Amino acid sequence: MRCPSLTRLPYRAVSGLPRSVVRLQSQNFLTRRCASTAVLRSPTAAPAYQSILNKHLQQRRNASGTAAAVLEAAASDNLSQEAIIENLDPVEAGRLSRVRNIGIAAHIDSGKTTCTERVLFYTGRIKAIHEVRGGDKVGAKMDSMDLEREKGITIQSAATFCDWVKKDEDGKENKYHFNLIDTPGHIDFTIEVERALRVLDGAVMILCAVSGVQSQTITVDRQMRRYNVPRISFVNKMDRMGANPFKAVDQINNKLKLPAAAVQVPIGAEDEFEGVVDLIRMKAIYNRGPSGEELFETEEIPEKVKSTVEERRKKLIETLADVDDEIAELFILEEEPTEQQLKAAIRRATIGLKFTPVFMGSALANKSVQPMLDGVVDYLPNPAEVQNLALDKKRDEASVQLVPYQSLPLVGLAFKLEESNFGQLTYIRVYQGTLRKGANVFNARNDKKIKIPRIVRMHSNEMEEVSEVGAGEICAVFGVDCASGDTFTDGQLGYTMSSMFVPEPVISLSIKPKNNKDAAKFSKAMARFQREDPTFRVTYDVESEQTLISGMGELHLDIYVERMRREYNVDCETGPPQVAYRETIGNRVEFDHLLKKQSGGPGDYARVVGWMEPTGKLDDNVFEEQIVGGSISEKFLFACEKGFHLACEKGPLIGHKVLGTKMVINDGATHMTDSSEMSFKNATQQAFRKAFKESNPSVLEPMMKTVVTAPAEFQGDVISLLNKRNATINDSEVGVDEFTVYADCSLNGMFGFSSNLRAATQGKGEYTMEFSHYEKCPPQVQKELIAKYLKAQADRHKK
């Protein structure tokens, strides 16, 4: 669980602090999810307070060690981030200050994997560069699956680690350790981005210099905000025709509503792109060497960009003045900030989630990637500067701050599972303590004791064995039976961490192996895929006697069918795609239903009275009892609620789940001998079905946020295609050589759209879809769906 970005500290003492310290602490400190010491320290903090605090902490350090004292304070008082940072052991503080846990996220084809390939090359992690769609048949390092290399897309997030050497102002070299995750861009694999951002401290958001902010950029922005992840931005593809980096900067400000400003200005663009000018140090930076591995810096700024440099530096300072107090004060006094002041302000604002600095370059052309790596060091937080909260099960799940000290009891989160040749591989982020090979850990979900047989650091599909991993690091372990989102501790603490957001599937397919002898391998594959991917669901429909797989889109399911063939040698037959329809009640309907079966032996008797009505929102269903006088006992009401939720799983209209329906039971009757929990459960289900049909109910269909991009010459053809599918066009943008249209379309109407779009645009158009909301079906479509469902039921009864 992450804390809100800004909350005031409670007016309580850190175990044993004097009241004078508490008062000052309450007045002068704020807690943020991401905060450096510079962000948190109050300029008005009294020296007396600091003296008392230092003395008190020194006494504690002598008595029982800083780590234990801070753990005690964290458990009881929501310890401030400043106290954690300032009381780190110097060795530990030095280690953490040189760690960055970052992800690379962006829209499809923005160059994430190409950029990651350069990062690995420039940090010395790989010895040669290979392209995503390269002619050498090797493929990018981070695309380790054959399918990824064939299709030229990232399907699974891939983790690696590398070391970056950065020179400080004095020319001294400092080595920084990066734990890096490359994520997919396609919306069908959004869970990979979701779970990566859940455990990362910062991110690089990549944008295309031609297209700017695109549909999946908006999705990635939403995910970063969900987990309060600070980000720097990198405008890639500066060598492409039509490149306009400042359009991307404006779109970050306007579309994403996030203050942004360029910290670099490109020297040339398109095929004349040469390098960049650093607006903070006012130096021109060029790449040299066969792969751009050498950097050349000069204070001579080209004449052709001098006016742009002055204008954009002024814009940078103005934007920072809006989000940072120190720069605002200098701006009012009309004083020019120094290089150190600008860097400190950008760091504060970025970590405080109020700003994103924008870098520029071209990964494919090997230009200006290294300055972006310096930006990761300068502006993204280290693990000690990030506030992560756990829930203490021993204290009614009260929030408690995790402290990144290696000497404290272990707390780690399993965020991804993957099958390998050596068994199940579990990716873990260690938030507190140390994870050691051979140690026993406890799964907080089921209190199961587990031994850690092997710990590895991942480099795409390669691994490097290690004996231990400290707080703030990411690793993988073998032979651990767990689920994605499980919390691991060493058993001393009753902590658990909240899991990541998992979107609901929107599309299903019936599937079966072509050959019955492959049934065992088919079942094994299905179990593995479900364990690895929370958005991939497998169900068995008893009525149709079919296995159904559900996921985020056609590509998502096609990939798993293909993986079944390649990895398990199982050819499958699939049915046509099935839309995840929903049903909902129309009007308020009262019911008085009696279930009575008495034929000599034990009978059934249950009477339920009440009403059903819409909740007003198309989300969870609600059951409520308003019994007065005990006409139905508590255990039977429990059975009524169970019956209601079972009935909601399979609606009366077309057999799909019910949304936005409320049932209230306010009266009823029981029989001394014939009433049972089963009879009340059945009576509630019968009352539900009858009342639901009388309420003028509706079938709901999923509406998809659809974004189509194609060359401008095909605009009319694309609009015509969407209109034929009854799409609602919300907006469109026309660029120099391409246009983008934003629309809401029913998922049912979009089947086959991919091939039609290719035909209409000579293979040059592309589109993305993301679930938006549920909407009532057109009456004719609802009528057809109900008729089809009734016919299928009648056919089954004949059998």
UniProtKB/Swiss-Prot annotation:
<feature type="binding site">
    <location>
        <begin position="106"/>
        <end position="113"/>
    </location>
    <ligand>
        <name>GTP</name>
    </ligand>
</feature>
<dbReference type="InterPro" id="IPR005517">
    <property type="entry name" value="Transl_elong_EFG/EF2_IV"/>
</dbReference>
<dbReference type="Pfam" id="PF00679">
    <property type="entry name" value="EFG_C"/>
</dbReference>
<dbReference type="InterPro" id="IPR047872">
    <property type="entry name" value="EFG_IV"/>
</dbReference>
<dbReference type="InterPro" id="IPR031157">
    <property type="entry name" value="G_TR_CS"/>
</dbReference>
<dbReference type="InterPro" id="IPR041095">
    <property type="entry name" value="EFG_II"/>
</dbReference>
<feature type="transit peptide" description="Mitochondrion">
    <location>
        <begin position="1"/>
        <end position="34"/>
    </location>
</feature>
<dbReference type="GO" id="GO:0005739">
    <property type="term" value="C:mitochondrion"/>
</dbReference>
<protein>
    <recommendedName>
        <fullName>Elongation factor G, mitochondrial</fullName>
    </recommendedName>
</protein>
<dbReference type="InterPro" id="IPR000640">
    <property type="entry name" value="EFG_V-like"/>
</dbReference>
<dbReference type="InterPro" id="IPR005225">
    <property type="entry name" value="Small_GTP-bd"/>
</dbReference>
<keyword id="KW-0342">GTP-binding</keyword>
<feature type="domain" description="tr-type G">
    <location>
        <begin position="97"/>
        <end position="384"/>
    </location>
</feature>
<dbReference type="InterPro" id="IPR004161">
    <property type="entry name" value="EFTu-like_2"/>
</dbReference>
<dbReference type="GO" id="GO:0070125">
    <property type="term" value="P:mitochondrial translational elongation"/>
</dbReference>
<feature type="binding site">
    <location>
        <begin position="236"/>
        <end position="239"/>
    </location>
    <ligand>
        <name>GTP</name>
    </ligand>
</feature>
<dbReference type="InterPro" id="IPR014721">
    <property type="entry name" value="Ribsml_uS5_D2-typ_fold_subgr"/>
</dbReference>
<dbReference type="InterPro" id="IPR035647">
    <property type="entry name" value="EFG_III/V"/>
</dbReference>
<keyword id="KW-0648">Protein biosynthesis</keyword>
<dbReference type="GO" id="GO:0003924">
    <property type="term" value="F:GTPase activity"/>
</dbReference>
<dbReference type="Pfam" id="PF00009">
    <property type="entry name" value="GTP_EFTU"/>
</dbReference>
<keyword id="KW-0251">Elongation factor</keyword>
<dbReference type="Pfam" id="PF14492">
    <property type="entry name" value="EFG_III"/>
</dbReference>
<comment type="function">
    <text>Mitochondrial GTPase that catalyzes the GTP-dependent ribosomal translocation step during translation elongation. During this step, the ribosome changes from the pre-translocational (PRE) to the post-translocational (POST) state as the newly formed A-site-bound peptidyl-tRNA and P-site-bound deacylated tRNA move to the P and E sites, respectively. Catalyzes the coordinated movement of the two tRNA molecules, the mRNA and conformational changes in the ribosome.</text>
</comment>
<dbReference type="Pfam" id="PF03144">
    <property type="entry name" value="GTP_EFTU_D2"/>
</dbReference>
<keyword id="KW-0547">Nucleotide-binding</keyword>
<feature type="binding site">
    <location>
        <begin position="182"/>
        <end position="186"/>
    </location>
    <ligand>
        <name>GTP</name>
    </ligand>
</feature>
<dbReference type="GO" id="GO:0005525">
    <property type="term" value="F:GTP binding"/>
</dbReference>
<keyword id="KW-0809">Transit peptide</keyword>
<comment type="similarity">
    <text>Belongs to the TRAFAC class translation factor GTPase superfamily. Classic translation factor GTPase family. EF-G/EF-2 subfamily.</text>
</comment>
<keyword id="KW-0496">Mitochondrion</keyword>
<dbReference type="InterPro" id="IPR009000">
    <property type="entry name" value="Transl_B-barrel_sf"/>
</dbReference>
<dbReference type="GO" id="GO:0003746">
    <property type="term" value="F:translation elongation factor activity"/>
</dbReference>
<dbReference type="InterPro" id="IPR027417">
    <property type="entry name" value="P-loop_NTPase"/>
</dbReference>
<dbReference type="InterPro" id="IPR020568">
    <property type="entry name" value="Ribosomal_Su5_D2-typ_SF"/>
</dbReference>
<dbReference type="Pfam" id="PF03764">
    <property type="entry name" value="EFG_IV"/>
</dbReference>
<dbReference type="InterPro" id="IPR009022">
    <property type="entry name" value="EFG_III"/>
</dbReference>
<comment type="pathway">
    <text>Protein biosynthesis; polypeptide chain elongation.</text>
</comment>
<dbReference type="InterPro" id="IPR000795">
    <property type="entry name" value="T_Tr_GTP-bd_dom"/>
</dbReference>
<dbReference type="InterPro" id="IPR004540">
    <property type="entry name" value="Transl_elong_EFG/EF2"/>
</dbReference>
